[in-house]
């Protein structure tokens, strides 16, 4: 019998081959995760003395747990990073406009350059924050239903006639309107700075 036919007829070799392949891919995945994660420092044997030490001690245990079971915690870690990133971005937006204006004041330069550089950047970061908070508030609000109370009250209750539908702006339209406003402000700053420099 040819070896190819023997391999096709014998299921044990095939199962063993797949087992080897699965073990190899798991090993590679584990090595890749270890390469991405930084090496975990050894935890001290003494008990933590303050709250900061407790917070530091919790992080290495989380990292070691993630290295042991990367597939199980992958989705939880992504969700945590997204929530943490949105919170950090929201905090950065509030601080960023002040930092930009402070950072550009000490530099000695012409008034046209500072007036052109600082306001549009601050305004752009402000608008991006507005868009993000608006999108968050739209996601958190549950949809309202107005006709349910009257339907539950009985047949004697007045039935409201549906009036003309109110146009609701979607998030993308609102952000595009804000971008247009931002562009108009930038253009007005440019025109005013050019007029100021020429006079």
Curated annotation (Swiss-Prot):
Compositionally biased spans, kind Basic residues: 14-30
UniProt protein name: Uncharacterized protein NECTIN3-AS1
Pfam families for the chain: DUF4672
Matching InterPro entries: DUF4672
Origin species: Homo sapiens
Region (Disordered): 1-71, 139-162
